[in-house]
Amino acid sequence: LMALWVVSQYLKIKNGKDFVPRTVIFGGKAAPGYYMAKLIIQFICNIAEVVNKDPDMDGKLRVIFLPNYSVKLGEMVYPAADLSEQISTAGKEASGTGNMKFQMNGALTIGTLDGANVEIRDLVGEENFFLFGKTESEIEELWQNSYYPQNHMDEETWEAINLIKGGHFSGGDTSMFSPLVDNLIYHDPFCVMADFHSYSKVQDDVSNTWLDRQKWNTMSLKNIANSGFFSSDRSIKDYCDRIWGIK
């Protein structure tokens, strides 16, 4: 989802449209046998190579992939981030703690109603959280009604997809990322296409908010101030009182 959005923003810049500068950082690793995850990482790295070498992108867009993302690497990333991308499809991901670490360090969150995002949004207030995407029940309804990804693709999405299909990020090789493209437009098990328009629109809200520095900083401080619920002290006390019955 995020990589596809970067491609769409790349196209906007190439077409001369206004763009609030971004440095987009990806981090992760793939299990040895997870072919699609490896292909996505290759795709991200290829996007970075094309974008970062394009003079039209200077001062506007940069893409970075951090390989073998780890706790140690996270110690440098969490304090440096302005925006936390918590974009799993609603109902598809177990709750983690990365979003809490970003929040405690002042990053604002763009995310779906999935995992601990729900608690973060409840704590900081909906006005201090960039919400996008379908809910878990809406995702279930899509599948019950025979979800077909192409029904959710607008002109912006098709332009990005066609650029990928044409080999722009694979040195002219039109087959390299065809498994990824075919998966998105014919299968899309994580409903990327269903969420893409909403995600792109909310990213515009992120950019506009960033330009209002006082508003952004106020939102950041409110996120930090309301992050205490996720502290280990609170969690341990809660366990002692409600489960273990000790002091």
Regions from the language model: what does each represent?
Residues 1-75, 79, 89:
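Long, K/E/R/D-enriched contiguous segments that form extended
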Residues 79-80, 87-220, 224-229, 234, ...:
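Catalytic binding pocket for nucleotide-activated donors in carbohydrate/polymer assembly enzymes
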Residues 22-24, 83, 109:
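Hydrophobic beta-strand segments of well-ordered beta-sheets in folded domains
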